[in-house]
A protein has these predicted regions:
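Short beta-strand-turn/beta-hairpin segments enriched in glycine/proline and small hydrophobics
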Residues: 1-13, 30-46
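ATP/adenylate-binding site constellation spanning eukaryotic-like Ser/Thr protein kinases
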Residues: 11, 48, 59, 64
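Short histidine-centered loop motifs in beta-beta connectors
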Residues: 16-20, 24, 53-56
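Surface-exposed, flexible loop/turn segments at secondary-structure boundaries
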Residues: 22, 39, 59
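Short hydrophobic beta/alpha edge segments that flank linear recognition/processing sites
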Residues: 26-42, 63-72
Length: 72
């Protein structure tokens, strides 16, 4: 089963990370909350799986298409 990269949909700041490596997540579970122009944007799991890695920290600026989380 191939890993799934979960990327940012826009340029924003990482406001809150809701998961940790090793966590089991379900489809549509919130992984990360981004903040842009005072709006909170949830980034959700596209499928159920296990969080393999998180490549950002709270407070980081991210760009559209940047990989935030890898699910196994």
């Amino acid at each position: 089963m191939a890993d799934t990269n979960v990327a940012s949909e826009l340029n924003a700041n990482v406001w809150k990370i809701e998961v940790a490596p090793g966590d089991q997540v379900g489809e549509d579970d919130t992984l990360i909350i981004l903040e842009s122009m005072k709006m909170e944007i949830p980034i959700v799991a596209p499928k159920a799986g296990t969080v393999k890695s998180i490549s950002v920290n709270e407070g980081d600026a991210v760009t559209e298409g940047q990989v935030l989380v890898v699910l196994a």
